[in-house]
């Protein structure tokens, strides 16, 4: 056992870390920061497109598109640097995003407009759950299809059922798999 595994918070980031890679990507501190940034960017984009089209220059549109499509790890690291000063995670996200529009005070002043930290956090957590669901759903659907196939193949295979550990009326393996 290596020291990293020994100091893990749980087996999920210790001995099972290889099996939880997708989960860690989404639910890590980095994942949360990136989701917060994404929510801020999408809100700013929505707000500008619906209420301040006059500020949507080609350069601003390009910046928003780039930020929306790929948030670099370096931006998340910048958020953590700012957070040391602000002691506020969402404010740090707001300030790091404002730096991306350096020199454009009009855009900077609209970042986080009409939003609370809870708005950012609740949507970010919802997106994280949606993303983990999407990444695991195909795996679960595969299991469901295999169980359905197994139930169909064994629909006539009689077996003794049990109630509270005691023998009960006969059933079929297919039925029991379907119930499962």
Sequence positions of predicted segments:
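A helix-coil-helix interface module used to build multimeric assemblies
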Residues: 2-180
């Amino acid at each position: 056992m290596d020291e990293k595994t020994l100091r893990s918070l749980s087996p999920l980031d210790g001995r099972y870390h290889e099996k939880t890679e997708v989960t860690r990507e989404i639910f890590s501190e980095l994942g949360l920061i990136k989701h917060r940034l994404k929510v801020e960017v999408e809100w700013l984009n929505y707000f500008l497109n619906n209420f301040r089209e006059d500020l949507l220059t080609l350069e601003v549109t390009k910046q928003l598109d780039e930020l929306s499509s790929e948030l670099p790890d370096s931006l998340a690291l910048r958020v953590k640097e700012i957070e040391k000063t602000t002691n506020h995670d969402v404010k740090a996200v707001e300030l790091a995003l404002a730096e991306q529009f350096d020199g454009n005070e009009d855009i900077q002043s609209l970042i986080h407009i009409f939003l609370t930290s809870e708005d950012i956090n609740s949507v970010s957590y919802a997106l994280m759950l949606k993303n983990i669901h999407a990444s695991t759903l195909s795996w679960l659907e595969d299991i469901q299809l295999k169980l359905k196939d197994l139930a169909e193949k064994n629909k006539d295979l009689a077996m003794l059922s049990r109630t509270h550990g005691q023998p009960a009326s006969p059933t079929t393996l297919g039925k029991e798999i379907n119930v499962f």
